[in-house]
Structure formats: C-alpha cells, structure tokens
Amino acid sequence: MLAPFACQPGESRGRQKPESMSTFRSPFQRDRDRIIHSSAFRRLKHKTQVFVEHEGDYYRTRLTHSIEVAQVARTISGVLGLNTDLAECIALAHDLGHTPFGHTGEDALARLMEPYGGFDHNAQAMRIVTRLERHYAEFDGLNLTWESLEGIAKHNGPVEGPLPYALAEANAQWDLELHTYASAEAQVAAIADDVAYSHHDLHDGLRSGLFTEADLMELPVTAPAFDEVDALYPGLEPMRRRHEALRRVFGRMVEDVIAVAQGRLEAAQPKSVEEIRQMGATVIRFSKPLYQELKVIRSFLFHRMYRAPSVMKERAKVTAVVNDLFPLFMARPELLPQEWRRDVEAAADETTLARIVADYVAGMTDRFALQEHARLCG
C-alpha cells in the first residue's frame, strides 16, 4: 500500500498525447517499460562512465550503472511506501542523455555548443524522451507521464537560473514546476545514483588496480567495513574480503538514507505528494555524519580514479574525437545518416543545425565514436 505522500498512479497528471489505460500495467510501469525498450537505453551498454580504452572489463558501463541505481531506488522507495515503479523509471532514465566518453565527452561537447545554447546531459535526457526517440506512430519521444518527466528534469532539486535549451523547450510544453522540489520518488532516484556510483567506483577502482584495500583502510566508511570483515572472517581470501567489505559500505549507505527519510517524514507528516514538493528541502538525504564521510571518499576517488594517469592519458584523445566530429558534421551535414537528413533539411538556422549535430554526437557509443572518427578523420 502506498503512503499518502507517494505518487499515486491513478492521480497522474497524464501524458502530452492522451492514451487509453493499460489493462495490466500502471502508467508508471508503462513509462519504465518504454525507457527499457528505447534505443537510447540500449546504447548505454557501450557508454562508459570512466573511459579507458582496452580496460572496459574493469569499469561499469552506463547501462549496468543504471540498473544498479534502479535496484537501489526500488529498495528505498519500497521501504518508505513510495511508488517503486516511478522511482525505478526515473532511475533508469537518469543517464540517457550522457555523451560517449563520460564527463570528458560531455565537457568537450558543451564547449562546442556554447555559442548555440550549451549542452547538459540531464537536459539531453529530457530531449531524448520527448523528441528524439521515434518509434511510435502517434508521437515523437516516449510520451511519458508528467510525473516521470518531472523526475527526470529536477531529481537533483529545483532548477534555477537560465535553463538548458532542451529543458526550456520541455518546460514550455509541460510546465514541470521547476521552482519546486520533485516527488519523493525522484529524490530517491537521485540519492540512489549517489549510493550506486560511490559503491561501484570503489569496486571498479580496486579491480583495475588504481588503488588497494590498504588505501581504503585509511578512509572513513570503508575502514570500519574491512575491520568488521577481518574480525568475522580472519584469513578470508582477498576477493571475498573485498566483496564483503564493500557490501557493508553499500548497506550502510542504504540504511542511512532510509533512517533519515523515515525521521524527516515522521516529523513533517506530509499528506500528499504536493506537500513533498513544497517542503522547501529534500526529504531524502544522507545523515550529516555519513555525508561528511562520503565527501572524503569522493575526494579520494576523484584523485585516485577519475584523475588517474591511465584515465588522464585518454582525455586528450577522446576530447579530440568530439572536437573533430562536431565541426565536421556542421560543415558537411550530408555525412549524417539518412534518418537524420529530414531534420537537417528542415533546420532554419545554424543553431538548429548545431542542436541536431549535438543530438547525433551525444547519442554515439564510445566504440562508434572512435570508429567514425577513424573513418572520417583518420
């Protein structure tokens, strides 16, 4: 049974294009299923978060990460009486707008798009689900419910200041109330992202040899976990020791989020999702002690993983790939695939063309971007 402050599927604000109700699935289940079956979701299989060529087995892809985020979101939302389908839907959609080559690729594309309104992966996810997926006879995009769109747009909180192009375009159509907080389900999806990447980046970094268990014995959160495992299982083989320690780190993060949320919900006693949106602060968050400890972990990961020599070595290379492909397609849009030509021919100005080229480049997988660069620029 859903809590009164959960998003009730029978009270959805609906879809841009009205559709008949499904006999067997709720509106949010249909949204989730459409995301899973989308082309953009499938492409996440070949997009890495940390790009190191020839070392892909060590690192999560955007697809595996999204699945892990969805699992965490379902767990937390289920305990809190929230709508697990909506939380899962937003979690699965949160990375759809990412470029090839992780944040390095996004930084390069964002710089190239500065004269044309910029580029932001969260806004690009909105563009994908409202416009770029073209599989249905009656609409472009996925025709998601308002609640799913709201969660994609502002799962990280109210959106202030100048809006990225894609988000401004979507908000003009749907009025996503960007000045308010999102539903509790969207907040759960956001913190599930933090839980998942904090956990799996530690795991991936250990597997790839960027740091060792001894390094983690010097850090908060991880050190007590290894101490507990060593006390319970002296002499445990390294791989099992590592897994047992990191699953305890993972469990502590999830339990902390649930405990804090239960306390805040008990204190606020919200009677509806609208009261959640108007609370003026997130109801889903880490406790202050754990948040401070996780800041230490993130700083460690930034220096030892995201700025590791093997990762930095690739940054210039993949930046060049994006820097070469974007202006090439701008100058010669006829090189774009046939299915993109209609949009190119309809482009009224250079800014519109740049947005089309950015859509195409952002949709590339790591492997395809490298192949296209070798073919067209080699």
Curated annotation (Swiss-Prot):
Any GO BP annotation: dGTP catabolic process
Native species: Cereibacter sphaeroides (strain ATCC 17029 / ATH 2.4.9) (Rhodobacter sphaeroides)
InterPro entries the UniProt entry points to: dGTPase, dGTPase-like, dNTPase_2, HD/PDEase_dom, HD_domain, PHydrolase_assoc_dom
Family classification: Belongs to the dGTPase family. Type 2 subfamily.
PANTHER family to which the protein is assigned, alphabetical: DEOXYGUANOSINETRIPHOSPHATE TRIPHOSPHOHYDROLASE-LIKE PROTEIN (PTHR11373:SF43), DEOXYNUCLEOSIDE TRIPHOSPHATE TRIPHOSPHOHYDROLASE (PTHR11373)
Single Gene Ontology MF annotation: dGTPase activity
Classification via Pfam families: HD, HD_assoc
Residue ranges of the region described as Disordered: 1-28
Domain of life: Bacteria
SUPFAM superfamilies (alphabetical): HD-domain/PDEase-like
CDD domains according to UniProt: HDc (cd00077)
Gene3D superfamilies xref list: Hypothetical protein af1432
Protein name per its UniProtKB record: Deoxyguanosinetriphosphate triphosphohydrolase-like protein
HD domain location: 62-198
Keywords associated with the record: Hydrolase
